[in-house]
């Protein structure tokens, strides 16, 4: 039996003050890309969400190099997700002594990086190969349908 080697590290950013919808717009562009390509994309995109995501990707790469000793060239973003956080509620004073509620959304961003140079070992003794029983093919016969002889659409008077 062989042990499974850990090849994934993650970085988690919680309570980031921006909408989850705006952060997902950036996350969808970097999912599945390499580390160096991701940094270039995040530096050149004109969105406000890029900076906290850039910091998380950089932190996940630092976790990978410190915990696993992996090289940054071999890192790929295997999973990136954005979840909605709590909504911070504030009051804005308005005219004639009134106040309006302001809702400031937050989000939680998770970046999971995988080292593609490390192989995962699988125990081959526990895998059993089984064949599915072959099913008999059903033969269908086609019959000619005559719509004029049994009261079709033109038989009405």
From Swiss-Prot:
Disulphide bonds in the chain: none
GO cellular component annotations of the record: chloroplast; large ribosomal subunit
Molecular function as annotated in GO: rRNA binding; structural constituent of ribosome
Localization per Swiss-Prot or TrEMBL: Plastid, Chloroplast
Example GO BP: translation
Database matches in PROSITE patterns: RIBOSOMAL_L22
Main location group: plastid
Top-rank taxon, per record: Eukaryota
Keyword Cytoplasm: no
Alphabetical keyword list: Chloroplast, Plastid, Ribonucleoprotein, Ribosomal protein, RNA-binding, rRNA-binding
Role of this protein: This protein binds specifically to 23S rRNA.
The protein's assembly and partners: Part of the 50S ribosomal subunit.
Family listed: Belongs to the universal ribosomal protein uL22 family.
Record protein name field: Large ribosomal subunit protein uL22c
């Amino acid at each position: 039996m062989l042990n499974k080697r850990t090849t994934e590290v993650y970085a988690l950013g919680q309570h980031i003050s921006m909408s989850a919808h705006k952060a997902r717009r950036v996350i969808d562009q970097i999912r599945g890309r390499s580390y160096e390509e991701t940094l270039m994309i995040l530096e050149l995109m004109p969105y406000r969400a890029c900076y906290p995501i850039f910091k998380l990707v950089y932190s996940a790469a630092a976790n990978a190099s410190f915990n696993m000793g992996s090289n940054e060239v071999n890192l790929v973003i295997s999973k990136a997700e954005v979840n909605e956080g709590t909504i911070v509620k504030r009051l804005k004073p308005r005219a004639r002594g009134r106040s309006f509620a302001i809702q400031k959304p937050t989000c939680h961003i998770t970046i999971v990086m995988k080292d593609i140079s490390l192989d995962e070992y699988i125990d081959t003794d526990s895998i059993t190969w089984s064949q599915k029983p072959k099913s008999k093919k059903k033969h269908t016969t086609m019959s000619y349908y005559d719509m004029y002889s049994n009261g079709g659409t033109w038989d009405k008077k």
